[in-house]
Amino acid sequence: MTIPAFHPGELNVYSAPGDVADVSRALRLTGRRVMLVPTMGALHEGHLALVRAAKRVPGSVVVVSIFVNPMQFGAGEDLDAYPRTPDDDLAQLRAEGVEIAFTPTTAAMYPDGLRTTVQPGPLAAELEGGPRPTHFAGVLTVVLKLLQIVRPDRVFFGEKDYQQLVLIRQLVADFNLDVAVVGVPTVREADGLAMSSRNRYLDPAQRAAAVALSAALTAAAHAATAGAQAALDAARAVLDAAPGVAVDYLELRDIGLGPMPLNGSGRLLVAARLGTTRLLDNIAIEIGTFAGTDRPDGYRAILESHWRN
């Protein structure tokens, strides 16, 4: 078997699944640790944070996949309108010192169509899955395929899409996949807005209003010592005051996205529309843990953690 050419220290671009699988296998046999960063392209600093986290692993070789997966787009979602910037994406990967880009076509990823797919658990029908009932089946199917093709030691996802991260961890656990799933904190603009490929669609007024999402989460974190309802009320007050922000949901869950206990660690998630653009955000939050007690030294870190999560 002839292994496709691989040039260390350069960006090697492969479009055939078999080629990247062969190169990954050969690199593992030499002792390199393969890291996978799945993306749909239109790369920004949030994606590059995943790349940098992967590169920090000793002995790593980083594979970044760029594939706009049609299976995760539902009815009424315009697949053709999704931003595609392949030349800019590859230039950014070269600048980061990435050695492998995997850029398959739809025909290469699904040569027999959607013959076999992943059926997610009940969580996939909640939150983001409510208005998008087939979305996470598409996400988990393509992630499983990427993991089988690349066979990485670790795979990296951003915490901004927190429900996706939880479902991928369920996939890996339920199918006994030999890979570690690494969640990387959300990267934010200077004013707190979570970085997203969708931000480019906001007009100036919408961009100014969009900061209400992170501001609402901050307000909730400050109010959380008084309990879950106080946290939700504080967040809702900020969102209600923001012009043009239509909230799809604001929910407090436990860290696995089950029901939130009365006290302890949780996740506060928000989705909202500004015009035709839909934005997501979330933070780690501690509910009632320090109510009626002296606040420990680490309390400020909890309140400030949304800038890193």
Swiss-Prot record:
Primary subcellular site in the record, as a coarse category: cytoplasm
**E.C. number:** 6.3.2.1
Compartments where located: Cytoplasm
Activation and inhibition: Pantothenate exhibits uncompetitive inhibition toward both D-pantoate and ATP, and non-competitive inhibition toward beta-alanine. AMPCPP exhibits competitive inhibition toward ATP, uncompetitive inhibition toward beta-alanine, and non-competitive inhibition toward D-pantoate. The enzyme is most active in the presence of magnesium or manganese. Other divalent cations (cobalt, nickel, zinc) are less effective.
Residues binding ATP are 40-47, 158-161, 187, 195-198
| Segments passing through the bilayer | none
Recorded GO molecular functions are: ATP binding; magnesium ion binding; manganese ion binding; pantoate-beta-alanine ligase activity
Pfam families documented for this protein: Pantoate_ligase (PF02569)
> To what use is this protein put?
Subcutaneous immunization with the double panD and panC bacterial disruption mutant protects mice for over a year against subsequent virulent M.tuberculosis (strain Erdman) infections; mice show mild lung inflammation and fibrosis despite a chronic bacterila infection. This is a promising attenuated vaccine strain.
Q: Name a GO CC annotation attached to this entry.
A: cytosol
Q: Active site: which residues?
A: H47 (proton donor)
Which UniProt keyword terms apply here? Acetylation, ATP-binding, Cytoplasm, Ligase, Magnesium, Metal-binding, Nucleotide-binding, Pantothenate biosynthesis, Virulence
Q: Which residues carry this modification: N-acetylthreonine?
A: T2
Explain what the UniProt record notes about the effect of disrupting the gene for this protein. Answer: Simultaneous disruption of panD and panC gives a mutant unable to grow in the absence of panothenate. The double mutant has a highly attenuated disease response in BALB/c and SCID mice; immunocompromised BALB/c SCID mice survive on average 36 weeks as opposed to 5 weeks for mice infected with wild-type bacteria, while immunocompetent BALB/c mice survive indefinitely. In wild-type mice bacteria grow for 3 weeks then undergo a steady decline, bacteria persist over 8 months in SCID mice.
Biological or metabolic pathway of the protein: Cofactor biosynthesis; (R)-pantothenate biosynthesis; (R)-pantothenate from (R)-pantoate and beta-alanine: step 1/1
More info: The reaction proceeds by a bi uni uni bi ping pong mechanism.
Q: Which family does it belong to?
A: Belongs to the pantothenate synthetase family.
Task: Briefly state the protein's biological role.
Answer: Catalyzes the condensation of pantoate with beta-alanine in an ATP-dependent reaction via a pantoyl-adenylate intermediate.
Q: What is this protein called?
A: Pantothenate synthetase
